[in-house]
Amino acid sequence: MTTSWSDRLQNAADMPANMDKHALKKYRREAYHRVFVNRSLAMEKIKCFGFDMDYTLAVYKSPEYESLGFELTVERLVSIGYPQELLSFAYDSTFPTRGLVFDTLYGNLLKVDAYGNLLVCAHGFNFIRGPETREQYPNKFIQRDDTERFYILNTLFNLPETYLLACLVDFFTNCPRYTSCETGFKDGDLFMSYRSMFQDVRDAVDWVHYKGSLKEKTVENLEKYVVKDGKLPLLLSRMKEVGKVFLATNSDYKYTDKIMTYLFDFPHGPKPGSSHRPWQSYFDLILVDARKPLFFGEGTVLRQVDTKTGKLKIGTYTGPLQHGIVYSGGSSDTVCDLLGAKGKDILYIGDHIFGDILKSKKRQGWRTFLVIPELAQELHVWTDKSSLFEELQSLDIFLAELYKHLDSSSNERPDISSIQRRIKKVTHDMDMCYGMMGSLFRSGSRQTLFASQVMRYADLYAASFINLLYYPFSYLFRAAHVLMPHESTVEHTHVDINEMESPLATRNRTSVDFKDTDYKRHQLTRSISEIKPPNLFPLAPQEITHCHDEDDDEEEEEEE
């Protein structure tokens, strides 16, 4: 007879983790199939699965798609008067990464941490360090909330733009026809500030996306630019069996239809042998022209799309949800009303940390799944270059050994210069494994602004949402403990506390003291017999009262 889990939980010795120190690892999926957890999420509570299209359902091939966007933007700049020489530039995917900040005053690309501390500074293709950096950033720090000056390049669509900004700054700084200035460049009596140059690039990028030929060229060669995954119909059909599925994209219907038709263009349906189904059949609700992030606030007028012509029908749609109907505009409130769902019932899956994740989380309370395609390469470096990480750990041990027997009475000063140089060299080698700007998530031991945003706003994240295929819909995604240095570097072993060295250590706050202190408290209050407050002292909770991030708030309410 098999022992049930509830019985095994009664005996800690039978817990799987106690059978083997590293037992948890054998229960984990393969790294490239994993979904990573910032906040616990019970999948069985999710009633609706929402999707963005661009870079989520439709993953664009890299660097082919970025190269196309780069070329079209350069052509647009040349057409409005920028030098012909710019046409010689080609997109280099090894340079940019997401999450960089462009300083519109000095023309620098900056990689910063969550607090605005500089991690990397590049002026064009020139990486600036030390005293040169401090001339422009005295404390190696920026005010991130100065959005007039600093622009965060957070999206995958920003990658070509990021590299183009570096190309332009480098060109105008080094081309002998122009005179480089601190905040821009001169051509004779004409001055162009980096702020003006940046605005020209922003306008050119928007023109390429909304008025130019980017979408036209994409649909002309979908096989070249769009990833097609045979597991997509299977996952969406399984989602539809356990809940409702909706699409909310900023793209117009004609483009959406062509992309989605290609993604579901298989001779079979969800499984080999099943009949082919049109892409619309996999969704309960389809919204185009969503205009996110406005969609998560006041939104826009909800209208109905004529799928034969792609044009919008006049008037605001006010009826119930109809299967097979495509809607334009609307808002996140519209989604909740039409699907009969509320905030935490919905898991929204997207790639845009601001337009998809931050706004859906902060304004609607939707659960969030961030798609980070770069994670596949980040994991490859993390595992393939493990020797570099191990060497850094060894160097830390060498440092600890040098200081092991020294305290404040020691006059000895160990020479750690060679170890410091080696740490810098290994850290640099590790950074370069990711690309010229280093990892998307860190610079050495410090996490980037992008990493902090992922941890703050994304409940779940993965290289692809297809990874949900490898988990049951009853799965509890449980967040790991986020350890502080005093927790991650101190072993779980008993330590005898010296009360003289640490007087506050005697301030034992655990409930085991309560019985002992009852008598002391009685001694303090025994003379007060006539008038007493309703409760003289707090009592230790006998039931769970703290929020432990187990995604079980509703279950607790039901139990009450």
Swiss-Prot record:
Binding site for Mg(2+): D52, D54, D351
UniProt-annotated binding residues for IMP: D52, D54, R202, D206, K215, T249, N250, S251, K292
Activity control summary: Allosterically activated by various compounds including ATP, 2,3-BPG/2,3-Bisphosphoglyceric acid and Ap4A/P1,P4-bis(5'-adenosyl) tetraphosphate. Binding of an allosteric activator is a prerequisiste to magnesium and substrate binding. Inhibited by inorganic phosphate.
Binding site for ATP: R144, N154, Q453, R456
Any single GO CC term annotated in Swiss-Prot or TrEMBL for this entry: cytosol
Disulfide bonds: none
Subunit structure of this chain's protein: Homotetramer.
Name listed for the protein in its UniProt record: Cytosolic purine 5'-nucleotidase
